[in-house]
Amino acid sequence: MATKIRLARAGAKKRPFYQVVVADERSRRDGRFIENMGTYDPTKNPAVFKLNEEKILAWLSKGAQPTDTVRQLLKKAGILDKATA
């Protein structure tokens, strides 16, 4: 089972809010997920990004691949550097 760390959309129309989740790559964007890692709210200025760093590092060590958007957010938070070190 290939796993991805990706964003699942929530919130109302025109007011997006995202959950950072670990999910099987075959499941739908907002469908079944394995574990919730945090939240991302792009509507705030600046955008609010909360993560459980320990869980993220654990899943990265297990081989979960972040999507491009999540990879950028992890770089901004400095978590991706810890995973590669």
UniProtKB/Swiss-Prot annotation:
Whether Ribosomal protein counts among this entry's keywords is yes
Can you provide one Gene Ontology molecular function annotated for this UniProt record? structural constituent of ribosome
GO annotation (BP), single: translation
| UniProt KW keywords | Ribonucleoprotein, Ribosomal protein
Family annotation (Gene3D superfamilies): 3.30.1320.10
Gene Ontology cellular component terms for the protein in this record: cytoplasm; small ribosomal subunit
Q: Which family does it belong to?
A: Belongs to the bacterial ribosomal protein bS16 family.
What is the protein's name according to its record?
Small ribosomal subunit protein bS16
Naturally occurring in which organism (per UniProt): Pelobacter propionicus (strain DSM 2379 / NBRC 103807 / OttBd1)
